[in-house]
């Protein structure tokens, strides 16, 4: 339930709360079409995907205009929840699978997120430098570095 997000992040603005609340229905729509998130795991959407993505924010606050790349974003995790949480931080979400980026672009458009760009590309072909690299279940640290 979205209330779990609100419990762990009580200082969210009303706009952020609305966006986090909307996430479930947007992903439910897409999950019925192309299985963005494991169907068995979807019932745990807010805890296993949204809160898990946001957990870094309990330890690290990103300053305005920081540039972050989310590698292997899949359905947009952790990038989309973090972009909602940090609206003045610039996120680039990449994935080699174009259908995943298609879904991510629809989520971004539906939530009117202006601080995210997307690319269908593998990390080794990215030329731009970023302040931080984030990912979930993509590769071991040695491979990413």
Task: Describe these PLM feature segments.
Residues 1-64, 69, 99-102, 106-116:
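Class I SAM-dependent transferase core
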Residues 68-69, 82, 91:
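Hydrophobic packing within well-folded, soluble alpha/beta domains
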Residues 70-74:
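Conserved S-adenosyl-L-methionine
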Residues 75-88:
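Conserved SAM-binding loop of SAM-dependent methyltransferases across substrates and taxa
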Residues 88-92, 96-145:
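S-adenosylmethionine
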């Amino acid at each position: 339930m979205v209330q779990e997000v609100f419990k762990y992040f009580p200082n969210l603005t009303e706009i952020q709360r609305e966006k986090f609340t909307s996430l479930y229905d947007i992903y439910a729509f897409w999950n019925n079409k192309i299985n963005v998130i494991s169907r068995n795991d979807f019932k745990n959407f807010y805890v296993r995907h949204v809160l898990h993505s946001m957990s870094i924010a309990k330890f690290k606050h990103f300053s305005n205009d920081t540039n972050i790349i989310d590698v292997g974003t899949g359905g947009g995790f952790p990038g989309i929840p973090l972009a909602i949480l940090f609206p003045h931080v610039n996120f680039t979400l990449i994935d080699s699978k174009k259908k995943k980026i298609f879904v991510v672009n629809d989520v971004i458009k539906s939530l009117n997120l202006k601080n995210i760009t997307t690319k269908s590309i593998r990390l080794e072909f990215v030329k731009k430098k970023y302040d931080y690299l984030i990912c979930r279940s993509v590769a071991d640290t040695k491979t990413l570095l």
